[in-house]
Structure formats: structure tokens, C-alpha cells
Amino acid sequence: MEIEDGSTRTGHVTCGSWIRRPEKANWVVLGRAARRRGSSVLSPGVIEIFSFDPRTSSLSSSPLATHTLEESDGDPIATAVHPGGDDFVCSTTKGGCKLFEVCGGETVIKISDQKPLPLEVVGPQKCLVFSFDGSKLAAGGVDGCLRILEWPNLRLILEEPKAHKSIKDMDFSLDSEFLATTSTDGSARIWKAEDGFPLATLARNSDENIELCRFSKDGTKPFLFCAAQRGDTPVVNVYDISTWKKIGFKKLIRKAASTMAVSLDGKYLALGSKDGDVSVAEVKTMEIYHYSKRLHLGQSIALLEFCPSERVLLTSSTQWGEMVTRLSVPSDWKDWQIYLLLLGLFMVSAIACYIFFKNSDSFWNFPLGKGQTRPKVSFFGDSKPSDDQSKGNPFGPVEL
């Protein structure tokens, strides 16, 4: 079941996500559909894990590990990686949801089956997402049923069969208090994650369909971003989560959005379109900083996710497969640059204090006598007192 030295690739990419590892290392887990010829299955679906090289902004040429799904499971359709980086959940077309553990080191790893989930017999789950603190898992079904589970004890918090017509997208807030969900019929609802209580249904115009949702993650004033289609115009609505009222909107992409993501530090918002474009905007100004036109030429972008530690996007489509794109945005400060700046500020402060001390008439500097002139300040050695200065001070140098 596990192949540690790579495997032959099968069908197209259907889902995927980044895996955060220690020391800012990152892996990518990808689900691939079975390869078929007519009604015959030539090779079953697989789950693969690749390493990421930040120097070349590319994935490894062969997977670190591969898990082959049973033919009865069908194809993988959604994945969610726990924030701890050791577990992930995968939903399949026929076998429900399965829990996997990533075992091993940085070069030789295994994907191991874990204990059965309560979601194994609930049918295909279009959306899977862990809360930011890893304490909850939400699953949104093609049938419109919403489930929220505690993690890791898997206690069922909510099972709402009629949450939506069919769940399209979902996201937890940064504090893991709220869950936002969208439907294929254009509606969007807000749920309290602790007990599953429905809090609000987002207001929308008569010609407006809410497609996607993401909470802000910068830790300041929290917002909810929703990609919506207003007639023929795609917009991003912004909602205040204290009132759940819309406070503004912005057009950030030319065609209808198919997927949406917010960077881990909350600085950037990305949209992938149904014709293969990618737009990245700064959240603070809502201005576009990066635009990749026809990144997946003529194909709807199915997967869009920011790398946890780099300004890099992972995208995929049915025809063009997975792509890793480095963003053309302003560079972030590196750790060594911050330390160098702090050291420079400290040295400037020390020099300023020294100059102030040498030129001050304070308790720590003996008061100037009558007719006494202030000594010259030397930065590179002790200056010798003049004869006039010695005569004006009969006590000589004073030591405290």
C-alpha cells in the first residue's frame, strides 16, 4: 500500500493541500483520480506526498510516499490537513472520508491508515476543513448535510441534513469560533462552531450568488470575504463579523471565481477563476499585487492554496495538473534583517546616550565650576585637559 521511493503517476489531480513541517519545511499532498479507459479502471486513485524546494519553487520530481486507494473507494475529491502536520483527512467518491497519518523523517515517509471516522459511510464530502487551532473538523456534503466534529475524540457536535441544497465552500474563523458555509444555490450561512447553532444568513442582492468564503487571518479587525457573482460581474464582498452586515465590495478578477484562499499571515487574498486566471490582492488595501493571466489556460482552477511559509501558490486543474507559482509581491523581512535592524537601532541609541552623558550637567557629571570650560568630547580616545582648565579646577579630576 505504501511506496517510499516514488510511483508512476495515474490520473489527473482532484484535490490537494500543503503540509506544514518543522523548521519551515513544507510538503504537498495530492489526490489523483483513477486512470480509466471506458468503464475499465486501468489504475486506481492514489494519494501522493511531495517535498517542496523553496529555492527553485518546485515540487520534487517523484513523490516521497504514495498510498493506493481501493477500487471500491473511488476517486479522492477533498483533503484537509491538520495544523499539526501529522494527520490528514481525505474524502472519496465512494468510500466516504478516511483518516491518514504521515510517519517517518524528511526523506523516507509512509502514509498509514488510522482509526475509522464517523464520516466513512456518509457519502461524498465536497468540503473538508480543520479549525485554525485544530480542535474541530467540518465536513460539507454534496447532499447539503453539514457536520462538525471535535478533534481528536471525533465527538459529533452538529449534524444538520438540511444546512444547504449542496455545500460548495466553507471556512473557520481565526479564533475557531465561527464557521461560514456557502451553497450551490447562492446562499451563505454562519454557524457557531462550539455547538453548531445557526447565527445568520448573509444578505445578498436579488441578482447575486455567493460562491466562496474565507475569513481574514491577520489577527486585527476580523472580516469575512465572500466571492460572489453579481449578474455577469464577479465581486468580493466584505462582511463585518460583529454584525454580519456587508460593509463593501471590490472587483478583483475578470471572470467568475472558482476557488479562494487567504495567506496564513492574513496579508494576501487570492482568487482563481473558471478560465484559469489567478489574482492576488493585499488585504489591507484590497489592491491587486499579482495577476497570472491564463495560468491554467481555459481550465477552471480547482485547487488554490498559499504556502505556509513562502509567497508561493499551489494551484491545479483537470487538464494542466498541479502548478507552483511564486508571487510577484513585495518581499517580506527575513529574520536576519530584523535582527540587524534591531542591532543598528541599539548602537545608535547607545551612541546618542553617550553623547548626551558627556554633554550634560547632571548629578552624575560634577557641576561646572566658576570660569570652568566644558571639556571637548573625544570619540576615539581621552582628550588631555588644557592648562587653563587645570588651573580653574583646584580639586583635580573627581572620581565617583
Where would I find each of the regions flagged by the language model?
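A short beta-strand motif characteristic of beta-propeller blades
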Residues: E2-S7, P63-L69, I109-P118, R155-E160, ...
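WD40/WD-repeat beta-propeller blade N-cap
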Residues: S7-H12, H67-D75, P116-P124, P161-I167, ...
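Loop/turn segments within WD40 beta-propeller blades
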Residues: W18-A25, A80-G85, L128-S135, M170-E177, ...
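Conserved strand-to-loop turn within each blade of WD40 beta-propeller repeats
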Residues: R32-A34, V41-S43, S91-K94, G140-D143, ...
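WD40-repeat beta-propellers
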Residues: I47-S51, C97-V102, L146-E150, A188-A193, ...
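Juxtamembrane amphipathic/hinge helix adjacent to a transmembrane helix
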Residues: F306-W333
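C-terminal single-pass membrane-anchor helix
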Residues: S331-E399
